[in-house]
Regions:
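Conserved core of the sugar-phosphate nucleotidyltransferase
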Residues: 35, 47-122
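Acidic (Asp/Glu-rich) catalytic motifs at the cytosolic membrane interface
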Residues: 204-235
Length: 235
């Protein structure tokens, strides 16, 4: 699907989640795969929970179907020998096809409820992407990016303004590290202001820094833009 969610298509988001763990290929390249290769297939018109993408890539012989009837297949991880059949099944061209030795699961039957990095429990999701529903999907992904355990200001005061600033950052192609750098500058300004006795200005700079600390994390999660240096920079 060409529809973007927070500036990323479904394919771009999946590729960022998996990184170097997989080698992207098209349907035309399936015939070139080695016999011992495995293939991970995703429909490009769905938004996938990050945990499902990672789990599917790490679990061979698995077909992911939606929970709602008629339980269409939306993703699969199969041996190369079954790639063509799995592709037809996920594409909807062969709804009744069977894949020998492949387990069928749905988001609700896969136990991935605990998201360690975000310190919260939430069922994994697979949602259809449409142009009309893109704003709702962006809100869903933004809400999902919040930690279950956080401070009261971050939980209740920052979400609405943070979402607007994240949207501006995506539009202006700002990176999370650039937002973090702006927060670091504000820390220095706050320290200088407190040293000079300008407590009001220093306090304002400090609060703005805490706001940007929320923004950079949300921007990183909704756009899947992160790096190890950036992780340490943020902390």
């Amino acid at each position: 699907s060409p529809v973007t969610i927070w500036g990323r298509t479904s394919r771009e988001r999946i590729e960022r989640i998996l990184g170097d763990a997989v080698r992207p290929c098209t349907a035309d390249q399936l015939a070139d795969l080695a016999a011992d290769d495995t293939v991970v297939i995703f429909r490009g018109d769905y938004l996938y929970d990050d945990r499902l993408v990672s789990h599917l890539a790490a679990t061979a012989n698995l077909l992911l179907q939606l929970d709602a009837p008629p339980h269409p297949a939306v993703a699969a991880h199969v041996p190369a020998a079954l790639a063509a059949e799995a592709l037809a099944l996920v594409d909807g061209a062969a709804a009744d096809a069977t894949l020998p030795g492949v387990e069928r699961s749905t988001p609700n039957t896969i136990t991935l409820a605990f998201q360690k990095k975000l310190r919260k429990s939430e069922p994994p999701f697979v949602l259809p992407i449409t142009a009309q529903g893109s704003r709702a999907l962006e809100q869903r992904l933004f809400d999902w990016s919040y930690k279950g355990v956080t401070d009261l200001v971050t939980k209740w005061a920052w979400p609405v303004p943070a979402r607007r600033v994240v949207a501006l950052a995506v539009r202006w192609r700002l990176t999370p590290n650039q937002v973090t750098l702006a927060g670091l500058v504000l820390v220095c300004i706050a320290g200088a202001c407190f040293s000079a006795g300008l407590y009001g200005v220093g306090l304002a700079a400090g609060w703005l820094m805490t706001f940007l600390d929320t923004v950079d994390g949300k921007l990183a999660r909704v756009t899947r833009t992160s790096s190890r240096p950036g992780h340490y920079f943020d902390h």
